[in-house]
């Protein structure tokens, strides 16, 4: 890699320069789990391929909502950007009405969330968001 010109170039640069076994570390059920630079890239590519299989097009908007700092958020973000789509990061603590407003304004077609609580909040306003095709939990 010669130069970073896009956000999704960063994981590839990181792997080439540092190739760390602990690019990300997240606590799951009280245990710390590491994700290497290579795993990060592989998982982001898998996300990109899955989104393309779902029909994502360049400039589509995809929302991401997480209640805490998680490896999956970063993987989703890079996976989204690699497809040419745009990430719409959202705070987990906003109201259902704010979710509906932001998702409508951004015209998000998919939303990825970290847990059932956020999923349920979105489900309660889903009928107000015509562009939203699906909500997924990571």
Mark where each language-model region is.
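Domain-wide signal for the mature, well-folded portions of proteins, strongly enriched
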Residues: 8, 27-28, 38, 125, ...
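A short N-terminal helical cap/helix-turn-helix that marks the beginning
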Residues: 2-23, 42
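Structural core segment of the AMP-binding/adenylate-forming
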Residues: 82-138
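A general structural motif
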Residues: 19-21, 59, 132
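Conserved AMP-binding/adenylate-forming core of the ANL superfamily
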Residues: 23-78, 95-100
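A general structural detector for well-ordered alpha-helical segments in enzyme core domains, enriched
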Residues: 10, 65, 118-122
